[in-house]
Amino acid sequence: MLGHMIKRAICNKWMVLACTVSIVIIYYEILLGWIPIRGMIKEPEYYNGLAQMVWLFSLCSYYTFSGMFPGLAYGSSLLEERNSGYLNYVKNRISLKKYMGYKVIAVGISGAVSTLIPYLSVAVPFSFFTRNSSVKFSKDFAELIWNRVITMWGEPAVYILRGLLMVLFGILWAELALLLSMVIRNKYIVYILPFVIYQILW
């Protein structure tokens, strides 16, 4: 049951949509010129990929909508299952408590994947520029928390920690969508409300 639920949480059209839109937004920002991508390709030794990635994510409009994407993938699935009658079918085969435990795990994984894939689409290629760069530390990090991380553990640690933060971010907002789907019967509100809450908190 859990394996099947995780498969459904990851392999669905909404996951593809969430990841695709996220990646398109991020790379659209790159093409707009936020990042000197041509210079990075022609003269990678003069550009620190990590510095450019941090700069990109600090300005990218992806974060404006990022609170909505984790829940889009699978967070509202409980509402759909309730409306379709599938939840009543499940109750006859497994306890509701156990099923909800599985649901929390599957939703958390879907949220993590929906944010990790877009992050890796940037972090992986930019990490090659970091390795080739003769610029080890950038002034962009002077007032950032990552400056201390680099000093203690090196630049790879920043990529890893940022990835973990993206995973936790995805889990948090996907679980929020699941929570909302327990009390709200309108799926469009469940999709949009996390975005509204995120904007208020942001």
Task: Go through the PLM ranges and name each one.
Residues M1-S22:
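Aromatic- and glycine-rich beta-strand/loop motifs that create alpha-glucan
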Residues V16-C19, I160, L164, L168, ...:
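Hydrophobic alpha-helical transmembrane segments
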Residues A18-I23, K187-L201:
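Central hydrophobic cores of alpha-helical transmembrane segments
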Residues V90-L96:
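Short helix-to-coil transition segments within interhelical loops
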